[in-house]
Amino acid sequence: MSAPVILVDADACPVKEEIYRVAWRHGAKVKVVSNSRLRVPDHPLIERVVVSDGFDAADDWIAEAANAQSIVVTADILLADRALKAGASVLAPNGKPFTLASIGPAIATRAIMADLRAGMGEGVGGPPPFSKADRARFLQALDAALVRVKRGLA
């Protein structure tokens, strides 16, 4: 069994530093995928992957790389769906896991919100601000996901 790999949808990810710390503790590889050259620590477990700036290029790369040994970190519901179908574990940056059971309702809610925004303009609102509790929940969830993947329970 190969070691777990954390695939990060990195362009707007607020928990990159937390990912690095947890990955180092577990000896897990991290692939930081973005459309631009983000700064990443110089560490043998961390790889920066810069994709083209084409629409969904980072999502496409992550979805192709995702498998049962992967943990994908993304707030993108459609990417989460693709990664789950590839067998990966998926976490939102706030620590909420996406699962095969929860992804359908999440996609439906996303579609409803898109329709509301289209009909009412941008005044519908978005997610709440990222909090310290979100960060703590993410750290716990990533640690637990890595343990599950290492044990083959994901």
From Swiss-Prot:
Membership in a protein family: Belongs to the UPF0178 family.
Name this polypeptide is given: UPF0178 protein Sala_2376
